[in-house]
C-alpha cells in the first residue's frame, strides 16, 4: 500500500506510512512531536531548559520532516514520465554510486551508503535523475537494507516494466558502529535481481563488472 500523508492543520507535521499503521485516530502534530523530543532529553539526563537545548525540540521535529520525507513521495510519480524515442536503444542503463542516507527501523540511527541501479529497457527509458530520486524516496524512510534494496527494484520493475532490474546497495550501519559491538568501517552488501538479470548469469556478471570499473 502506498504511503500517504494524513492531513491535519499543521503543515510541518510528519507524514505517516499507512501501510504500517493499522489503527490511528489522530496523527500527532508538531507540538506533540516537540514534546516527545523534550521527554527524550529528560530521559537521557539532560536539562531541556538550558540555553543550548531550548530550540532543540523544534529543530529535531523540523529535521525529521526532511529526514523522513520519503513517506510523502511516490515512485509512481517520479517514474511516470518516460521517453520512447531512444533510437532503438535496448541495452543496459546503469546509474552507479548513488549516495544516500537512511535510518535503521530498529534503532532510528543512520545508514550511510551508495546504490547501484541498472535496468534493461523494454521500449521506454526514464531520465537518469529519476533513478536517483527513487533511491532517495525509499531511503528517507525507516528501513532495513534488505527492504530498501527490494523496494527500489520492485518499483522500477512494476512501473517501467523493463526486461530486468539489478540493484546493489553497499552501506555502513551506525547501529553497528555507534552501539553494541561498535565495529566502525564494516559494510553490508545486498542485491536484488529481476527478469533477465535474475535468469541470465551473463547479465549479472556484466552488471557486477560495470559497477566495479
From Swiss-Prot:
Catalytic activity: GTP + H2O = 7,8-dihydroneopterin 3'-triphosphate + formate + H(+)
Pfam families for this protein: GTP_cyclohydroI
Superkingdom: Bacteria
Pathway stated in the Swiss-Prot or TrEMBL entry: Cofactor biosynthesis; 7,8-dihydroneopterin triphosphate biosynthesis; 7,8-dihydroneopterin triphosphate from GTP: step 1/1
Entry EC no(s): 3.5.4.16
Entry-linked SUPFAM superfamilies: Tetrahydrobiopterin biosynthesis enzymes-like
Keyword annotations of the record: GTP-binding, Hydrolase, Metal-binding, Nucleotide-binding, One-carbon metabolism, Zinc
Annotated Zn(2+) binding sites: 104, 107, 175
First-level EC class: hydrolase
GO biological process: one example: one-carbon metabolic process
Any GO MF annotation of the entry: GTP cyclohydrolase I activity
InterPro entries, A to Z: GTP-CH-I_C/QueF (IPR043133), GTP-CH-I_N (IPR043134), GTP_CycHdrlase_I (IPR001474), GTP_CycHdrlase_I_CS (IPR018234), GTP_CycHdrlase_I_dom (IPR020602)
GO cellular component: cytoplasm
Similarity-based family: Belongs to the GTP cyclohydrolase I family.
Protein's recorded name: GTP cyclohydrolase 1
Gene: folE
